[in-house]
Amino acid sequence: ERLTMLVIPQSGEVTMVVPRLEVARVTPQPGVFSITAWGETENPVAIVAKLLGNAKSIAVGDQMWARFLVELLPLVPTATFVRAVDVVGALRMSKDASEIAALVAAGAAADRVATQLHSGLIPLIGRTEAQVSADISARLIAEGHDVVNFAIVAAGENAASPHHHAGSRVIAKNEIVLCDFGGTMNGYCSDITRCV
């Protein structure tokens, strides 16, 4: 609900516009971007518009809230708006050897947790989905992930829900258990889905 935006001009300084109350959560990156904090009485969209200046074309991320975009449009009336993915999508898909190695490592760590599930090292029967989810999360961290982004465990009829939230349902013998989990390891994400 509060605007946080990275403004990347064609030339010049990159700026992270962030609510003042969130500044402590932003890791400073000197030489990469500066931080402009906005207070409760300031209009963050006006700050972004000022940073954009006379930009002729503005690429906007797909996750930008419509309310902020609608406020921004009249503040930069001569600009053309495009989807950021159309501009940087190809760049994001291109990986050097170190990035590929980081992706492989993150995937391999998740694969090891999946193997632990299949081999029974993470017990299922008689335990709740939430307990198994917690075990998967702990194993991802033990395998080198910095953060667990999700650990969905869905037993029986719950497996029909693609983004089920693990709960108090107890897993019974001879039923399908869908496990969808992943996290971030050295800045790169893993994501794996398996049925046990």
Please annotate each region the language model reported:
Residues 107-118, 129, 136-137:
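Active-site pocket-lining segments that scaffold enzyme catalytic pockets across diverse folds
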Residues 61, 118-127:
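Conserved short loop/turn motifs at secondary-structure junctions
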Residues 1, 85-89, 126-196:
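Short catalytic-site patches enriched in acidic/histidine residues
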Residues 51, 71-76, 120, 135, ...:
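Alpha-helical structural signal in soluble globular domains
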Residues 1-112:
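A composition/biophysics-driven feature that prefers long, compositionally simple stretches
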